[in-house]
C-alpha cells in the first residue's frame, strides 16, 4: 500500500462515520503548493462554502501559498463565509492528512474566526 492509498483509506473511514452522524463537514485538502477547504452539507451532495489559496483574493495577500500562513488565511476565510451563511457547527474532516502543520493551522484559524468543532 502506497502513501496515497493509505491516506484515502483513512479518509474514507472518517467520512463514513461523519455521514452516519449527519454532520456538516469542514473538509481540508492539501497539496505541496495549495490548500483547499470546503464546508459540505450533511448529505454530502452540496458544497455550502469554499476557500482556497488558488483564489486571487487570498493568494494576493500571501508571499507563498504552501505554508502555515496561507493555511491560516484559508481557515479564516472559510470560517467567515460559513458564519455569513449561518453555519456555526461543523465536523472537521482532515481527509486522512496528519493533524499537524498546515492542517492544524487551518483548523486553529477557523476556530479563532468563530467556527465550532
Curated annotation (Swiss-Prot):
Record bears the keyword RNA-binding: yes
Pfam families: Ribosomal_L18p
Keyword field: Ribonucleoprotein, Ribosomal protein, RNA-binding, rRNA-binding
InterPro entries: Ribosomal_uL18_bac-type, Ribosomal_uL18_bac/euk
Gene Ontology BP annotations: translation
Statement: the UniProt record of this protein carries the keyword Oxidoreductase: no
GO molecular function, one term: structural constituent of ribosome
One GO cellular component term: cytosolic large ribosomal subunit
Assembly description: Part of the 50S ribosomal subunit; part of the 5S rRNA/L5/L18/L25 subcomplex. Contacts the 5S and 23S rRNAs.
Family classification: Belongs to the universal ribosomal protein uL18 family.
PANTHER family xref list: 39S RIBOSOMAL PROTEIN L18, MITOCHONDRIAL (PTHR12899), LARGE RIBOSOMAL SUBUNIT PROTEIN UL18M (PTHR12899:SF3)
NCBIfam families to which the protein is assigned, alphabetical: L18_bact
Role description: This is one of the proteins that bind and probably mediate the attachment of the 5S RNA into the large ribosomal subunit, where it forms part of the central protuberance.
The protein's name in its UniProt record: Large ribosomal subunit protein uL18
Record gene name: rplR
Amino acid at each position: 500500500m502506497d502513501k496515497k492509498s493509505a491516506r484515502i483509506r483513512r479518509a474514507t473511514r472518517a467520512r463514513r462515520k461523519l455521514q452516519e452522524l449527519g454532520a456538516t463537514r469542514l473538509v481540508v485538502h492539501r497539496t505541496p503548493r495549495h490548500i483547499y477547504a470546503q464546508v459540505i452539507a450533511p448529505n454530502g451532495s452540496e458544497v455550502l462554502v469554499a476557500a482556497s489559496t488558488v483564489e486571487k483574493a487570498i493568494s494576493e495577500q500571501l508571499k507563498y501559498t504552501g505554508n502555515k500562513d496561507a493555511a491560516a488565511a484559508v481557515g479564516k476565510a472559510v470560517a467567515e463565509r460559513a458564519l455569513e451563511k449561518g453555519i456555526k457547527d461543523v465536523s472537521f474532516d482532515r481527509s486522512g492528512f496528519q493533524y499537524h502543520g498546515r492542517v492544524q493551522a487551518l483548523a486553529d484559524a477557523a476556530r479563532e474566526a468563530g467556527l465550532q468543532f
